[in-house]
């Protein structure tokens, strides 16, 4: 996986007013944390983060270049750990970066991508995907963009488990092998209607009369 360059600078304030000023200038607050850097508050370009997420994804390897107002810039190898967004607007609030070493293995989540056409779907079945990511461990440069799940051999009642997936070279699955990834279930049958009752209704009881 290629390394993406991203410029950042130390954060110069805090609070709602500061965040609003960042937004007006096309910036968002961020933080990078790790063994060497500790915790460093930053601000980065919103569009640059959007481009990384759109073109490369959350597992992009990032060389974060922190440029202070004075002194030399410092570079940190990192991945995006979390993205905080508005609950219903496509608007970034905050980005968390995690400093990594390119020489050390890490554990991360990788998206699953279904490929092929399942014969069971043609027969009327329904394909149900139970998980959309798997945990993997590998060197940062070996993080795959996605893991393919070929469903072209699935008939009704069949399933694919994590143990059935093929891991790329240098990648190990950490998700339990017994976990079901996708299953092909039979179509739902319409419930049979209860047969209508036939015959004459029993006569209503005659009320008692006094003697």
From Swiss-Prot:
It comes from the Bacteria. Belongs to the bacterial ribosomal protein bL25 family. CTC subfamily. Residues 200-211 have a biased composition (Low complexity). The keyword Nucleotide-binding does not apply. Part of the 50S ribosomal subunit; part of the 5S rRNA/L5/L18/L25 subcomplex. Contacts the 5S rRNA. Binds to the 5S rRNA independently of L5 and L18. It comes from Desulforudis audaxviator (strain MP104C). This is Large ribosomal subunit protein bL25. GO terms for biological process: translation. Keywords: Ribonucleoprotein, Ribosomal protein, RNA-binding, rRNA-binding.
């Amino acid at each position: 996986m290629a390394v993406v360059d991203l410029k950042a600078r130390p954060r110069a304030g805090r609070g709602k007013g500061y965040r609003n000023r960042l937004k007006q200038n096309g910036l968002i607050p961020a933080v990078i944390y790790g063994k060497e850097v500790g915790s460093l508050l930053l601000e980065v370009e919103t569009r640059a983060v959007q481009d990384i997420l759109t073109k490369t994804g959350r597992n992009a390897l990032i060389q974060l270049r922190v440029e202070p107002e004075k002194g030399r810039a410092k570079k940190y190898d990192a991945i995006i750990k979390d993205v905080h967004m508005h609950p219903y607007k496509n608007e970034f609030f905050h980005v968390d970066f995690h400093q990594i070493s390119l020489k050390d293995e890490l554990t991360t989540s990788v998206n699953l991508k279904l490929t092929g056409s399942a014969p069971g779907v043609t027969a009327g079945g329904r394909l149900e995907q139970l998980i959309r990511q798997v945990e993997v461990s590998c060197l940062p440069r070996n993080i795959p963009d996605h893991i393919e799940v070929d469903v072209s051999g699935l008939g009704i009642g069949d399933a694919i488990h994590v143990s059935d997936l093929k891991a790329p070279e240098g990648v190990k699955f950490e998700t339990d092998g017994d976990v079901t990834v996708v299953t092909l279930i039979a179509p739902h049958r319409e419930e049979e209607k209860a047969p209508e009752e036939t015959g004459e209704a029993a006569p209503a009881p005659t009320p008692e009369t006094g003697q």
